[in-house]
C-alpha cells in the first residue's frame, strides 16, 4: 500500500481523522469543498485498521450578520450533522495526477492545460505525460507528449476550428492525461467546452454574442430530508426540471 487518500464530501465545517488511535496530521475546514486526508503513513498493510472520523459542525468562525450567512443556517438547510454524502478510501501509487485543469481559449483556438502531480516519495518526479483529446463527435485529435521533471506542468494544446459550447449547442470535448513514471501509470479524465464568457458595456457575452440569463434561486426546497441531494441522479432531476422550464442557470443558497 504505497499511498492512501480519504475523501469526505458533504459535511459541515471541521473534520479530523484518527488511524489506529493516532491522529492524522492536519485538519480540514471548509463548508463546500471535499476534505482530503493522506493516510499513507498511518495505515498498516494486511491488518485491520480502525478509522475514526470526527465532524464538528459547531460555528467555527463568525461569517454572518444576525446569523444570516446562507452557507450556515437552518433557514437554507446548510447546518447538517455528521456526514451526508460520499466517504471514499482510495489506494494510490507513489506518484499520481492530483489535478488536471483545462482553460479554453477560443480566440487562439487552444486549450491551456495545467497538470499537478502528487508524490509520496522523496526523489524528484520524472517521466512522461501523454495528453489526448476527443472532440464532441468522438473523433480523436492528435496526441501530445510532454516530458515530466516537475510536479507542475503547463502547456498549450491546439483545438483547430473548435466546435463552440453554449446552452443551445453544448459541445463537449473529453481530455485524458496519462502519466508514466517510475514503472507506474496514472490517468485522469476531464470534460470541457470551448467557450468565452465576457462582458461588453456591462452586458454578458458568450462567444461574442449577447447572453441572457434566465434562472431561479434554489433554497430550502427539500423538506422531506432537510438537505440537498447527495447523488448524481438527484441533481440530474433538479437541473432537468429547470431546463424543461426554459432556464439556463441556477443560483444556490443550500
Where do the language-model regions lie?
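Beta-strand-rich binding/interaction modules
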Residues: 110-147, 153-155
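Conserved, mostly hydrophobic/aromatic
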Residues: 87, 173, 208
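Accessory beta-strand-rich segments of carbohydrate-active enzymes
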Residues: 4-5, 9-96, 120, 249-253
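Active-site-adjacent substrate/metal-binding segments within catalytic domains
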Residues: 4-5, 13-18, 25-29, 62, ...
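Short strand-edge motifs at loop-to-beta-strand transitions and within beta-strands
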Residues: 33-37, 151-157
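Surface beta-strand/loop "capping" patches
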Residues: 91-122
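Short glycine/proline/serine/threonine-rich loop/turn segments at secondary-structure transition edges
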Residues: 43-48, 61-63, 159-172
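Conserved aromatic beta-strand anchor motif in extracellular beta-sandwich/beta-rich domains
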Residues: 17-21, 129-135, 179
